[in-house]
From Swiss-Prot:
Membrane topology type: Single-pass membrane protein
Organism expressing this protein natively: Invertebrate iridescent virus 6 (IIV-6)
Protein's name in the database: Uncharacterized protein 466R
Main location: membrane
Keyword set, alphabetical order: Membrane, Transmembrane, Transmembrane helix
Superkingdom as given in the UniProt entry: Viruses
Places the protein is found: Membrane
Transmembrane segments: 69-89
């Protein structure tokens, strides 16, 4: 990499200071961005349609997926506790 007129520090800074990519069509970028989203992420109000809000929006689909896993986990825990109590009574 030959960048004439720049010191080595300026070369490193110019290479590391890349702007954040905002591409809406790539699922890979959405997957990488989904790690930044948590339950504290507000639901965006600029989604085009309420019916596709949970399926198309990467933020909303990430939240929906986490809630779904939480409910599956809680249901499995209830079943396990029920089976343990049932075996203790027999």
């Amino acid at each position: 990499m030959n960048m004439p007129g720049k010191t080595p520090i300026e070369k490193i800074v110019s290479l590391s200071a890349k702007p954040f990519k905002v591409s809406r069509g790539s699922p890979r970028d959405d997957k990488e961005r989904s790690y930044e989203n948590t339950f504290r992420t507000p639901i965006p109000y600029n989604c085009p349609d309420v019916s596709t809000h949970l399926s198309d929006c990467p933020v909303c689909s990430n939240l929906y997926g986490k809630e779904k896993l939480l409910y599956i986990f809680l249901g499995a825990m209830i079943v396990i506790i029920f089976l343990v109590i049932k075996n203790q009574l027999n």
